[in-house]
């Protein structure tokens, strides 16, 4: 007369554990993708800033070196256009010798710096980056030839994890012939 029907609807413990496992895997994968995207964005932003800083420094040095004058008095570069003190230190007479006098670019403590007669030493690149290599090479500074300066610079970001690194080289000759 009475039929007992099983009207208990629900999940078994195994079904619940399987669904929690699948949900955890999906959330873990989504979190991993999000964290990877943030790391990639941070790396890209650092790389863009590195390009900006390096480009500014190279343009600044190129303009100053291109506009340099021959040191006819011999006070700055011993009568030459450029004087390489060591491979990471260049000295020359500024285009406006009255205002700036002798100008220098050099590497000091992993920072690219500039100095002239009338100003203190100033950094050209943000302290968030370190210059791992700076080399100046002068060719053709003998009498009768137009001098050229080749600059090689390697800059790297400072921070935890993988940081971008940039190597750049350029060659500059003086704008005004003074041979």
Report residues per predicted region.
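Type IV pilin-like appendage domain
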Residues: 72-143
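Short linear sequence signals and composition-biased patches located at protein termini or domain-edge surfaces
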Residues: 121, 128-179
């Amino acid at each position: 007369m009475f039929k007992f029907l099983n009207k208990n609807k629900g999940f078994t413990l195994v079904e619940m554990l399987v669904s929690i496992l699948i949900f955890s895997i999906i959330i873990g994968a989504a979190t991993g993708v999000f964290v990877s995207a943030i790391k990639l964005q941070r790396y890209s932003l650092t790389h863009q800033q590195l390009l900006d800083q390096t480009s500014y420094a190279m343009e600044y040095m190129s303009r100053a070196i291109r506009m340099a004058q021959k040191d006819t008095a011999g006070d700055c570069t011993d009568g030459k256009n450029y004087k390489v003190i060591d491979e990471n230190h260049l000295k020359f007479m500024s285009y406006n010798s009255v205002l700036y006098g002798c100008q220098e670019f050099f590497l000091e403590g992993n920072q690219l710096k500039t100095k002239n007669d009338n100003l203190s030493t100033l950094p050209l690149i943000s302290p968030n980056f370190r210059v791992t290599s700076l080399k100046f090479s002068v060719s053709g500074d003998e009498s009768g030839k137009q001098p050229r300066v080749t600059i090689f610079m390697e800059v790297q970001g400072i921070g935890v994890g993988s940081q971008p690194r940039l190597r750049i080289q350029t060659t500059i000759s003086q704008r005004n012939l003074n041979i």
